[in-house]
């Protein structure tokens, strides 16, 4: 049985699983779908064409599915899609997409979104991501699986943050952070490989060693980016556990539009 507080407003048309819990004074819009066992905190607003999966916990005063902060937006029925088992803490804001991009903002599974985080229009957040309190994502930002974004950080529009990367607190990021790399500062600069995070996630010693070698080629040996990429491709043919992550690193760099931090 759905547990909806008598002061909450669920507009006609909303599709709410019978196991969902909705707290006092929450507002659920007519185009919202909420999956099983999700809880919505008091005073939260879930609006727009928003789909929320199962087992999510949304804290009080969150604003989910709001209009994009984009002056080109003209009330198009763009979307927000949220996966399963996410924690979205109080006062977080997540906006729908725009037609200038794919028209959808996405948040995957098992993410930990702390208080006052902003996820702008057309962002694509993967799985197992941690966004610390007051981290601010501008529009069109992409964040790979297992990335960690420190509190009070700002990420420029269209920036990409690779899988297993880490951005330190109070950083200003204006270019892409390659996978596995730690970045910090204003403006953010590279500070090594996220070794501890990789160990916790089961990366082998050989894979971590290969990524450390890749980091030296990219940042420590005085090579141009093209020279470094050539040597990285050679490193990725070594035949060990490091081949796949080094290849992922090269593919990320090749796809960069804003350039990587250097």
From Swiss-Prot:
GO biological process, one term: lipid A biosynthetic process
Principal subcellular localisation of the protein: cytoplasm
Pfam families: Acetyltransf_11 (PF13720), Hexapep (PF00132)
GO cellular component assignments: cytoplasm; membrane
Keyword Cell membrane: no
Gene3D superfamilies, sorted: Hexapeptide repeat proteins, Udp N-acetylglucosamine O-acyltransferase, C-terminal domain
Membrane-spanning parts: none
Annotated localization: Cytoplasm
MF-aspect GO terms: acyl-[acyl-carrier-protein]-UDP-N-acetylglucosamine O-acyltransferase activity
Subunit structure: Homotrimer.
NCBIfam families linked: lipid_A_lpxA, PRK05289.1
Family designation: Belongs to the transferase hexapeptide repeat family. LpxA subfamily.
Protein name as catalogued: Acyl-[acyl-carrier-protein]--UDP-N-acetylglucosamine O-acyltransferase
């Amino acid at each position: 049985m759905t547990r909806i507080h008598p002061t909450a407003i669920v507009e006609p048309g909303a599709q709410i699983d019978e196991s969902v819990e909705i707290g006092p004074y929450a507002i659920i819009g007519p185009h919202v779908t909420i999956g099983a066992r999700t809880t919505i905190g008091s005073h939260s607003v879930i609006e727009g064409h928003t789909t929320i999966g199962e087992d999510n916990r949304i804290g009080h005063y969150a604003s989910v599915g709001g209009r994009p902060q984009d002056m080109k937006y003209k009330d198009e029925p763009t979307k927000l899609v949220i996966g399963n088992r996410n924690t979205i803490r109080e006062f977080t804001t997540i906006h729908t997409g725009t037609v200038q991009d794919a028209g959808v903002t996405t948040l995957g599974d098992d993410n930990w979104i702390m208080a006052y985080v902003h996820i702008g229009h057309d962002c694509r957040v993967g799985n197992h991501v941690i966004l610390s309190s007051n981290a601010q994502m501008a529009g069109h930002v992409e964040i790979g699986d297992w990335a960690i974004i420190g509190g009070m950080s700002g990420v420029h529009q269209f920036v990409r943050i690779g899988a297993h990367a880490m951005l330190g607190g109070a950083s200003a990021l204006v270019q892409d952070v390659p996978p596995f790399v730690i970045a910090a500062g204003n403006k953010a600069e590279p500070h090594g490989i996220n070794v501890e995070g990789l160990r916790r996630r089961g990366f082998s010693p050989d894979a971590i060693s290969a990524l450390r070698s890749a980091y030296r080629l990219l940042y420590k040996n005085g090579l141009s980016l093209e020279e470094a990429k050539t040597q990285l491709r050679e490193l990725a043919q070594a035949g060990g556990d490091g081949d796949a992550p080094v290849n992922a690193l090269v593919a990320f760099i090749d796809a960069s539009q804003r350039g990587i931090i250097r």
